[in-house]
Amino acid sequence: MEQEKRQINLPVFLDYQSTTKTDDRVLEAMMPYFKQFSNPHSRSHSFGWKAESAVELARERVASLINAEAKEVIFTSGATESNNLAIKGVANFYKNKGNHIITVRTEHKCVLDSCRYLETEGFHVTYLDVQKNGILDLELLKSSITDKTILVSVMMVNNEIGVIQPIEKIGKICHEHGIFFHTDAAQAFGKISIDVKKMNIDLLSISGHKIYAPMGIGALYIRKRQPRVRLTPMINGGGQERGMRSGTVPTPLAVGLGEAARIAQEVMEEENIRIRELRDILYNEIKKHLPYVVLNGDYEQRIAGNLNLSFPYVEGESIIMAINNLAVSSGSACTSASLEPSYVLRALNIEKDLEHSSIRFGIGRFTTREEILYAAELIVSSIKKLREMSPLWEMVQEGVDLNNIKWDAH
């Protein structure tokens, strides 16, 4: 193990659900479009034609990864914008048809906040609970649909607990009721197989920096037929991206997303096998040497690179400080600066101490076996030390049932 430690660079990055390093191949593909710049919408000269050709190739590559047509993909600044455009765009365009939207309590904050905004505009939103394993109950979804429901938004893969929702079945339910179905696929695109036709998806949000492309670029798939989806744009201007998203498409960033999609299509299957093996090693090593470790979210219906664990009798923030040579998260990267427990874990209806002691490990393309073994050893030794300092741990060791204790308020 000492030799393995010397082979790794510290700190070890295990936060791949928050972001990913831009792949060197992606960066290489982008560089010419920084140097030989032009506006892809300038169609009166060869500079513009070249830029446009590069953007359209990128669009085709993104579309290919989800079995869509290139014309059904528009470029955005990222998944947050895509989610906002999908939800608000459908709601505003079809508001005369209905004013009811269904989503899930464990969605990304940009989906939840888009829905809350629409509530101030007179829309009614149903926020569905999930089961204890993080998966949506389809019967609950069915029973929530009304004749005013126009949109259902359910994320494909959860950013905190990594669970994969039964998207194809959800899409089928939506289409049987004539309802549009949107899915936030920021954590799924390039990680699992996606077929928008087979999965009955009408709108799908994509993030570049989650799949080894740069920050600042994303995409939105918008179904063109059976049914055709129409949106009210949020950004008005030159009418780029089929009038859905005005503004000059950043050629280098679009090229980067396209190249990342091409690479993902090539390596996804093999990469998932390797990443899943690393995740299993991490989980098994921790479980083998530590008692009272709780897995958050379903283990089987989960992307390969996610592991979310709670370590009772210690606080998540103290764990983070104790393992400062590991870059991990105690919640969603968008909200982990807050000391409030994760709303995703709260939605699982687990004990409060488990909410506060959770750590999310994100494993990705550049994670090595040596890093995983180092991480497991550091986690085990750190949790043991923290528990030794915890009076609650001492009581548990003595056989005291903490649930039966009545604490006096001071």
Swiss-Prot record:
An example Gene Ontology molecular-function term: metal ion binding
Positions of post-translational N6-(pyridoxal phosphate)lysine modification: 210
UniProt family annotation: Belongs to the class-V pyridoxal-phosphate-dependent aminotransferase family. NifS/IscS subfamily.
UniProt keyword Iron-sulfur present: yes
Top-rank lineage group of the source organism: Bacteria
Protein's UniProt keywords contain Magnesium: no
Pfam families: Aminotran_5
Function: Master enzyme that delivers sulfur to a number of partners involved in Fe-S cluster assembly, tRNA modification or cofactor biosynthesis. Catalyzes the removal of elemental sulfur atoms from cysteine to produce alanine. Functions as a sulfur delivery protein for Fe-S cluster synthesis onto IscU, an Fe-S scaffold assembly protein, as well as other S acceptor proteins.
Cofactor(s), by name: pyridoxal 5'-phosphate
GO biological process entries: [2Fe-2S] cluster assembly
Regions annotated as coiled coil: none
Amino-acid positions noted as binding [2Fe-2S] cluster in the UniProt annotation, renumbered to this chain: 334
NCBIfam families: IscS, PRK14012.1
Subunit: Homodimer. Forms a heterotetramer with IscU, interacts with other sulfur acceptors.
Name the record gives this protein: Cysteine desulfurase IscS
Catalytic activity: (sulfur carrier)-H + L-cysteine = (sulfur carrier)-SH + L-alanine
Signal peptide: none
Keywords: 2Fe-2S, Cytoplasm, Iron, Iron-sulfur, Metal-binding, Pyridoxal phosphate, Transferase
EC identifiers of the protein: 2.8.1.7
Residues noted as binding pyridoxal 5'-phosphate in the record, renumbered to the chain: 79-80, 159, 187, 207-209, 248
Record-linked InterPro entries: Aminotrans_V_dom (IPR000192), Aminotrans_V_PyrdxlP_BS (IPR020578), Cys_deSase_IscS (IPR010240), Cysteine_dSase (IPR016454), PyrdxlP-dep_Trfase (IPR015424), PyrdxlP-dep_Trfase_major (IPR015421), PyrdxlP-dep_Trfase_small (IPR015422)
SS bond partners: none
Compartment annotation: Cytoplasm
Active site: 334
